[in-house]
Regions:
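Transmembrane-helix bundle of Major Facilitator Superfamily
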Residues: 2-187
Length: 187
């Protein structure tokens, strides 16, 4: 068995898939922070609407993480991760093409529901895949690093995309990532 075959059938591939689906979740927590002037101008937003667009993601996600973890215990975390990834991808499309403040707020709320499904599913997958304590600690460190790194990278990515593309591009980048991860997860 070649090194590639070993990797493809290993728990390290599972970790790669898990952190790849988790990365957009953490990026989306901060990607819009640099987009506020562009969003305000493009959608003619009030200060209240702008606050809701930014804050709804964290508020909804924080409120749903525990219930989604309990749901994952019932239906299985792989299924929860797939459903969350599909919802996150579809909500990203809706957010990217929103034409009103309330459509964007609703899309960000749906993004948060998908994120609340993905977060406990990825953490549980890491916990249940790596049974050796030393490997599990290493894998959890990678998972946490991706989360923190994604949140730190969000404003940089948002600034770059806003400089070169329409504001909706900050959401469109999620779609191919979610599509690839869902395909890998199902097959």
């Amino acid at each position: 068995m070649s090194n590639l075959e070993k990797f493809m059938s290993s728990k390290w591939l599972i970790l790669a898939i898990v952190v790849l689906i988790y990365l957009p979740v953490s990026i989306d927590a901060t990607v819009l922070h640099v987009a506020t002037p562009t969003l305000s101008e493009s959608l003619s937003l009030s200060a209240n609407q702008l606050l809701w667009i930014i804050d709804i993601y964290s508020l909804v996600m924080a409120g749903l993480i525990l219930p989604m973890g309990a749901l994952g215990d019932r239906i299985g975390f792989k299924k929860l991760m797939i459903i969350g990834g599909i919802l996150f991808g579809l909500a990203s499309l809706a957010a990217a093409f929103s034409t009103t403040a309330w459509a964007l707020i609703g899309s960000r709320a749906l993004l948060a529901v998908g994120a609340a499904m993905i977060l406990p599913a990825t953490l549980s997958t890491v916990r249940n895949t790596f049974l050796d304590e030393k490997q599990r600690n290493f894998a959890l460190g990678i998972w946490a690093t991706v989360g923190g790194g994604g949140a730190a990278f969000g404003p940089l990515l948002g600034g770059f995309l806003l400089e070169h593309f329409h504001w909706g591009s900050v959401f469109l980048i999620n779609v191919p990532i979610m599509l690839a991860v869902i395909i890998f997860t199902i097959f």
